[in-house]
Amino acid sequence: MSEMTPREIVSELDKHIIGQDNAKRSVAIALRNRWRRMQLNEELRHEVTPKNILMIGPTGVGKTEIARRLAKLANAPFIKVEATKFTEVGYVGKEVDSIIRDLTDAAVKMVRVQAIEKNRYRAEELAEERILDVLIPPAKNNWGQTEQQQEPSAARQAFRKKLREGQLDDKEIEIDLAAAPMGVEIMAPPGMEEMTSQLQSMFQNLGGQKQKARKLKIKDAMKLLIEEEAAKLVNPEELKQDAIDAVEQHGIVFIDEIDKICKRGESSGPDVSREGVQRDLLPLVEGCTVSTKHGMVKTDHILFIASGAFQIAKPSDLIPELQGRLPIRVELQALTTSDFERILTEPNASITVQYKALMATEGVNIEFTDSGIKRIAEAAWQVNESTENIGARRLHTVLERLMEEISYDASDLSGQTITIDADYVSKHLDALVADEDLSRFIL
């Protein structure tokens, strides 16, 4: 898992997300506490439970983006789910236990990649030997059995040198590779994904591990052989246990749109996709044991981060038990004009950088001036104020409208430099921004 300090985590998040310092700090502290807990003695470690977080803020201010970036930094099993996709147990739809199953699947995949990477050097050696066996077949005795040579022949060593230098990369060879497992696609109703995956694995194992001769260039064969040999060096049972340990000790679940499962007013009849889901989430967040195809997983030390806009509902509309299990509250602020300006220029891959790169593929050089950036930010903020406030997502709409003409004519503008300043922005957007009806439908 990540050993970054809270300051380093916030610094990394700053490269992609503007503002929202409180949310970044809370998430960074929660992530660091995962590492701190693992440094404790085993007895105390079991007593330290994660402090789950509830992020509250209007749409488009960076809640989901924080989760996306955190997933890359965490180096731990991580899954992001939408609260609206689940229903109460016993009704048609996904049940909340599938969150932990999906998290465990992600952990198995992550641990497998790490194990293969750890065995890569040995796998490369074995793959090299298999290719050399094809190029220079080993000597056989009178009974047709391969003789074990004490020392590699001079010819084999010469070919090994050429292979490592890449001189044989384009030479074609025929080599036996493990045949791809039989592809079986089973469509199952929601909530029965576990049974589907078990049936699929059963059908795939029916064929056994068959070898299939394939004709490939040496550089392509080497890649496939390295993967095959590395997979052989990995113990599946150890891998499953390591994955379950990783989920139990370091797993992070991000639940988005949690405000959409708040109860709205008085309603008769069962509320299976709202309050029912909240009730089902309680044992997961508090700590329970979930059965997965890889084994039993305890959720006591999984960190849960929930987020919601809470424009219609309020955090107090969540059932009290769930509120108590999300003790850390972080409020994200609505974005201002100056935030929009920073969003357009400061992140590593800001929208303006993306548009410049896209147009450069057609030979068109785009220049955004400071006055142009400021005017775009003002236009986006103005439309947000007069219609629905969708935060930074409005910048995509405004910029797409602004760049439409250039994008359409780009192939005819090759070699030209187009400067987008305040006058250019005003000319293309002022009429739309000023007319509230037009901006409501177009921007």
From Swiss-Prot:
GO cellular component terms, semicolon-separated: HslUV protease complex
Record GO biological process: protein unfolding; proteolysis involved in protein catabolic process
CDD domains to which the protein is assigned, alphabetical: RecA-like_HslU
Annotated SMART domains: AAA, ClpB_D2-small
UniProt-annotated binding residues for ATP: I18, G60, V61, G62, K63, T64, E65, D256, E321, R393
InterPro entries assigned: AAA+_ATPase (IPR003593), ATP-dep_Clp_protease_ClpX (IPR050052), ATPase_AAA_core (IPR003959), Clp_ATPase_C (IPR019489), HslU (IPR004491), P-loop_NTPase (IPR027417)
Keyword Chaperone set for record: yes
Keywords of the record: ATP-binding, Chaperone, Cytoplasm, Nucleotide-binding, Stress response
Induction profile: By heat shock.
GO molecular function: ATP binding; ATP hydrolysis activity; peptidase activity; proteasome-activating activity
Location of the protein in the cell: Cytoplasm
Main location: cytoplasm
Pfam families reported for this sequence: AAA, AAA_2
Assigned protein family: Belongs to the ClpX chaperone family. HslU subfamily.
PANTHER family: ATP-DEPENDENT CLP PROTEASE ATP-BINDING SUBUNIT CLPX-LIKE, MITOCHONDRIAL-RELATED, ATP-DEPENDENT PROTEASE ATPASE SUBUNIT HSLU
HAMAP family hit by this protein: HslU
Physiological role: ATPase subunit of a proteasome-like degradation complex; this subunit has chaperone activity. The binding of ATP and its subsequent hydrolysis by HslU are essential for unfolding of protein substrates subsequently hydrolyzed by HslV. HslU recognizes the N-terminal part of its protein substrates and unfolds these before they are guided to HslV for hydrolysis.
Subunit structure: A double ring-shaped homohexamer of HslV is capped on each side by a ring-shaped HslU homohexamer. The assembly of the HslU/HslV complex is dependent on binding of ATP.
Protein's name according to its UniProt entry: ATP-dependent protease ATPase subunit HslU
Gene source species: Escherichia coli O1:K1 / APEC
Biological classification of the source: Bacteria, Pseudomonadati, Pseudomonadota, Gammaproteobacteria, Enterobacterales
